């Protein structure tokens, strides 16, 4: 009975979400406003209890999702997804061991949910609009065409020895063929790992080897911002060090010829030989769907594992409810498919919902700073989802590039990847959205699978505050923790952001190292999932994300462990020690700052600095190159030899007068020493301007 009642409640909520594109009144940043709607699970704010008494309301459904997960998620999974075999158990989870299981006993195929079900109903509906690098050259792909391409590619993979459970690396820019490659893997039960087509050969090889990939799929070249990217050359260098790779399937984005070696297979030629029909493999709910590598605070990037049913359900529901997506809408997420945002909100969420999804191959400023908005006008995009880094960049070009184009099709604007500052939020809302579009600042992670905290879903007319994620999605139960591991109660408080209950979209493990998964996410606060982020909870129960609490920095929305940069720097023979920290950056949100110690025998330190920048770009990616590299005689260390990065961060953020506890510092005089070097560097930069 509870499940049926809940299902009707969700239905009422889905109906009430229609028409939320009008922006409610907003206070300016930093100014509180009258609270008209509570948020979060029961207990997060006093207003929740009263609001939860209204059946079918956001607070009521949110409280029910927290109180009765099986009754909430069970009917949604049954009605949203196409099943081969029904599940017998909705959930079986234990945070103490990192055990996460949803919809156990059920079997389905993700590609059937994303393609076949829509082809049966409306085969000529547009699935993808490929916004290619050159504006005005977009290509539309119907669901029928995408299914046929997927099946041909799936059959090609099978012919080249890929079986259920095998891993396939996809090193491709945003394109219909890249989407088909993901879905082809899903169709035959293979596991894909999409690797951002900007990573170096060394980073690519590390991920291929960790995943033990049997096949790599790539293009001869890529096009981005008017430049040619030599993808095949990077793959050639990488696979020299990848013993598990048996074939490299090479498609062509340009007409330019590339070297084809013994491993290489011309993909289009092989696909043309294959049948456009491929029987889908029936997969268990908890079988691996994909792994995606994300940076940790230490060591090699982690292969985050997502599985079939729970991930797909969560991606589809968050896409529909957070963005108010309606049938016939054009959904424009401009993220790369090499990141989780591209997985969930370019591919799996929109396609499961039968949406038309835009694939954006270019950059925000090619050929000019109006590119996003010209694309919105030409494609008539209804929901636009992008990163604060791009917003901050475009803001500096002024309003004229925005106002030049018709943006009346837009109803929802979304921000993702990092906290958005007030200035960027206000500009996006006022200038881009004409003060009428709903702006959703979304918080989530690779590990969460989908959006966890956002202004929507909510009650109709509920307030939205600038630069604030605000309300937990259904089933997300946020908790703030203090340094002692105790729950922080009440309002206007800060703490480590944890989640106290499992949800379907969350990651299941780190590939090949479940203990690392447990240690990274469940050890710091036993019984809770630790996000690694800090948060602030307001009087109304809303959440504002305050940033990372570990040694992970967020550069233009790309998470990167400082240890990765330090490891790359350590390979230089003239640099015995380094410390990398993140610091605020006007455009990127955060940037990397490296302090290095150079050997006396090294010679010209300026040459060393340039060599280090080249090494980091080669070993990781260009975006990982530190904006500043400062040569110092020594690093501040504790008596036990630990580098005190906190003090270095204070120095470069002009907080050197408030260093806090330095009693464990081996030699306090080092602070003045580094400050002097840093000030000389700043003076030199100022003089150069």
From Swiss-Prot:
Positions of CoA binding: 224-227, 341, 556
N6-acetyllysine: residues bearing it: 396, 642
Subunit structure: Interacts with SIRT3.
EC assignment: 6.2.1.1, 6.2.1.17
GO biological process assignments: acetate biosynthetic process; acetyl-CoA biosynthetic process; acetyl-CoA biosynthetic process from acetate; ethanol catabolic process; propionate biosynthetic process
Matching InterPro entries: Ac_CoA_lig, ACAS_N, AMP-bd_C, AMP-bd_C_sf, AMP-binding_CS, AMP-dep_synth/lig_dom, ANL_N_sf
Keywords from the named record: Acetylation, ATP-binding, Ligase, Lipid metabolism, Mitochondrion, Nucleotide-binding, Transit peptide
Role according to the record: Catalyzes the synthesis of acetyl-CoA from short-chain fatty acids. Acetate is the preferred substrate. Can also utilize propionate with a much lower affinity. Provides acetyl-CoA that is utilized mainly for oxidation under ketogenic conditions. Involved in thermogenesis under ketogenic conditions, using acetate as a vital fuel when carbohydrate availability is insufficient.
Transit peptide: 1-37
UniProt similarity note: Belongs to the ATP-dependent AMP-binding enzyme family.
Residues covered by region (Disordered): 17-46
Any one of the GO CC terms: mitochondrion
Superkingdom of the organism of origin: Eukaryota
Catalytic reaction list: acetate + ATP + CoA = acetyl-CoA + AMP + diphosphate; propanoate + ATP + CoA = propanoyl-CoA + AMP + diphosphate
SUPFAM superfamilies referenced in this protein's UniProt entry, alphabetically: Acetyl-CoA synthetase-like
UniProt enzyme class: ligase
Record text on activity regulation: Inhibited by acetylation at Lys-642 and activated by deacetylation mediated by the deacetylase SIRT3.
Cell compartment(s), UniProt: Mitochondrion matrix
GO molecular function, one term: ATP binding
Compositional bias segments (type: Low complexity): 32-46
Gene of this entry: ACSS1
Species classification: Eukaryota, Metazoa, Chordata, Craniata, Vertebrata
Listed name of the protein: Acetyl-coenzyme A synthetase 2-like, mitochondrial
